[in-house]
UniProtKB/Swiss-Prot annotation:
Any one annotated GO CC term: small ribosomal subunit
Protein's name according to its UniProt entry: Small ribosomal subunit protein bS20
Summary of the function given for this chain in its UniProt record: Binds directly to 16S ribosomal RNA.
Homology family: Belongs to the bacterial ribosomal protein bS20 family.
One GO MF term attached to the UniProt entry: small ribosomal subunit rRNA binding
InterPro entries cross-referenced by the UniProt entry: Ribosomal_bS20 (IPR002583), Ribosomal_bS20_sf (IPR036510)
GO annotation (BP), single: translation
Keywords associated with the record: Ribonucleoprotein, Ribosomal protein, RNA-binding, rRNA-binding
A Pfam entry, by short name: Ribosomal_S20p
């Protein structure tokens, strides 16, 4: 249990930060799910728009420290590869 005021404040800050980070992580997952749905539907135009949104959201999470930079880059790279594969199949 926190005994001094600084430790109590740290607990409050951590609780707020955890809530914000959870929301950000959830938001990233939502955009990734939208991209997955667009890929499953096979619609290249919708998938490209969803990819741009997902990439933006992932990089925002990276900049906020919610996701490790390498993880964000890896996910974006894999999404781009899947989008490219869909484009090539459609062409």
């Amino acid at each position: 249990m926190a005994n001094n005021p600084g430790a109590k404040k740290a607990i409050r800050k951590i609780a707020r930060r955890t809530e914000v980070n959870t929301a950000r992580r959830s938001r990233v997952r939502t955009f990734l799910r939208k991209f997955e749905d667009a890929l499953a539907a096979g619609d290249a135009a919708v998938a490209k728009a969803a990819f741009i949104e997902a990439q933006s959201e992932l990089m925002r999470a990276v900049s906020k420290g919610v996701v490790h930079p390498n993880t964000g880059s890896r996910k974006v790279s894999r999404l781009a590869a899947r989008l490219k594969k869909l484009d090539q199949a459609a062409a």
